[in-house]
Amino acid sequence: MTKNNIDASAVSEGEVTANALLEALGTTLEPDLLVEALTHRSFSHENPGAKNYERLEFLGDAVLELVSTETLYKAHPDMNEGQLAKMRAKAVSEESLSKIAREKLHAGPYILLGHGESDQGGADKSSILCDIVE
């Protein structure tokens, strides 16, 4: 056991996943934070001590809503509140965010899933891909 009593192979798998995604994205981020952002609850249940993305998803959801609201508000000064709300809802919908994860980030192969979720194709589930973007 290492880092917070997580199995060494799980830590290694997470680090390899984070490093591969950082390289693919051509960016630098805190690797431990990226591992957390890519860790599904099912993986953390099988690897006690592993943090999953749920808290980051909570924060990311609020940030996405704020940024999309401000962007739409400034970009469309003639639209009313209802029109802006519809545009924002579409921009931050599961469909839109999972498409970004699938087609732009190619995030599926990097998501750390528990065995059962992985066997059920969790890396391609829209709900999980959406959570990763949030």
Which sequence ranges carry the predicted segments?
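RNase III-family endoribonuclease catalytic core
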Residues: 2-133
